[in-house]
Structure formats: C-alpha cells, structure tokens
C-alpha cells in the first residue's frame, strides 16, 4: 500500500477518490479512514494504486523499526558480554577522570565512536600502564555495541592463557576461542606486549589479525610499550606489519593513576 510520501516521490498525476474512478472503497485497517487512489499514466494506460491517507502505516513501520533496533542492540550487548574479558565494574566515558595528559587519548576514543563506519581505520594506543587505556577501550566497546556494531574486547594475556589451556583437551579448542574474534566487526586487543607468547600463540595471533584484515574488520590495540617498534620483537614481524597497516597511532602521555593515588595518600599522611 502506497503512502503519501511515496505518492510525492513517484510524482503521481493526481489523487482520486474511489467513487470518482469506480474503484472499491478501501479503508485503513487501523483508523478506518478512506484510502485514495494514486493515478499514474504509463504505456498509454492509467494505473490506479491504493494510497494511505493517514499516518497509521508510517507509525506502525516506525514502531517495528524501533523494536528491531532494540533487538539488535541487545544481541550485540549479549555478544560483547558473552565473548569478552570484561571486568565486573562497568566502564563508561561519563566516568572518565579528565586530565590534561590523557585528554587527546580520550578525544581519540570518543571520535572513533562518533565517526565509526564499517571498515574504519583502527587504533594502536600506547603509553604507560595505569593511565586509562583499558577503561576507554571497554567504554568504546559498550558504546559501539549500543550502536548495533558487533564488538569484542579481549585482554591479550587472558586470551593467551585461554589458548594455552586449550592444549589440555579438557575444554574448548583454540579454534573455538578464536572464532568469536574473527566474527566481530570491531576487535579490541588490550594489553598486547605484556608478555612474549610462544611461537604457537604467535601464529594464532597472526591468524586473528590477518583474518580481521581480510574481512575489513576494525582492530584496536592497546599496549604499555614506550616505542611502537618494540612490538615487533614481541609479536613477530607479520603481526606487527599488519597492525601498522590497520591502525593509526595514539600516544597516551598520562601517568599511572594508581601511582598518583598512592602518592596522594602518602602526602596526606605526612
């Protein structure tokens, strides 16, 4: 059934009442308002199409779209929670403690969320430990999931441990651990470089990164390295080269908030 907007879009010749052109009287099933007929002239013939003259169909469509949007958000939040290494405490952008040293990093994360599109360039965020990279990464993952983006957050040391444990054969396989990562649109690998993996885990890491590259997924990496080149000896040349191609660099120049809190406590007790 055509709507008034469609009538305008298709530039119908005119609107006709049913009685005017000898057509059956049709009414909206919801409000009972009589429908008109939109007449177009095509191939030497008049074609009359019933047209809704009320907003019922539009309202029903909008309600359906809103329901589908909420379902999609729930699916992606459930996906994030089921497949990620998330802490119990929720991390949000609103809870972020702003400092001059970390403001550029914060802005980079917010800008990513606001401007994300499928295939967006990723980020390699590096800097001192304890300066909020994980907090911002978790907040980003949650916001993207709410936008309907399939996102996953993995703490790399925990991911490596999961892969090591898969060798025992008592749990899930390495392939099953990796599959949700390669099926996501945005993947966050947090704390890469905290430990040097075995060659087997290196190969799995490259498989993950290369799969994301081939599927045009977006990769976000955080690391406590002081120089980007330090990653090469830790994760291997192949993974390193892929990250350089997939990510822009964001340097978090902040210092550890845990150290700052400890210093404040010490100062208060003097």
Protein language model features and the residues they cover:
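Phosphate-binding P-loop
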Residues: 112-120
């Amino acid at each position: 059934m055509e709507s008034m907007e469609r009538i305008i879009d298709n530039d119908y010749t005119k609107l006709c009442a049913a009685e005017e052109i000898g057509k059956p009287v049709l009414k909206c099933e919801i409000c009972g308002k009589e429908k008109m007929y939109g007449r177009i002239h095509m191939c030497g013939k008049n074609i009359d199409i019933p047209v809704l003259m009320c907003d019922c169909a539009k309202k029903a469509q909008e309600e359906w779209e809103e329901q589908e949007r909420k379902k999609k958000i729930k699916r992606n939040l459930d996906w994030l929670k089921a497949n990620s290494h998330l802490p119990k405490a929720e991390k949000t952008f609103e809870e972020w403690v702003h400092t001059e040293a970390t403001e550029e990093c914060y802005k980079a994360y917010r800008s990513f969320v606001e401007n994300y599109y499928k295939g967006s360039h990723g980020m390699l965020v590096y800097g001192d430990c304890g300066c909020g990279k994980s907090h911002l990464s978790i907040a980003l993952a949650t916001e993207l999931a709410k936008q309907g983006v399939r996102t996953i957050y993995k703490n790399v040391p925990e991911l490596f441990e999961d892969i090591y444990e898969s060798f025992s054969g008592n749990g899930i396989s390495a392939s099953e651990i990796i599959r949700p990562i390669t099926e996501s649109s945005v993947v966050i690998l947090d704390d890469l470089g905290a430990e040097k993996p075995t060659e087997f885990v290196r190969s799995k890491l490259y498989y993950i990164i290369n799969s994301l590259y081939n599927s045009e997924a977006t990769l976000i990496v955080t690391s406590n390295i002081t120089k980007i080149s330090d990653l090469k000896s830790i994760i291997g040349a192949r993974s390193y080269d892929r990250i350089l191609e997939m990510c822009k660099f964001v340097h978090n120049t902040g210092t550890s908030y845990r150290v700052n809190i400890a210093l404040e406590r010490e100062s208060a007790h003097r």
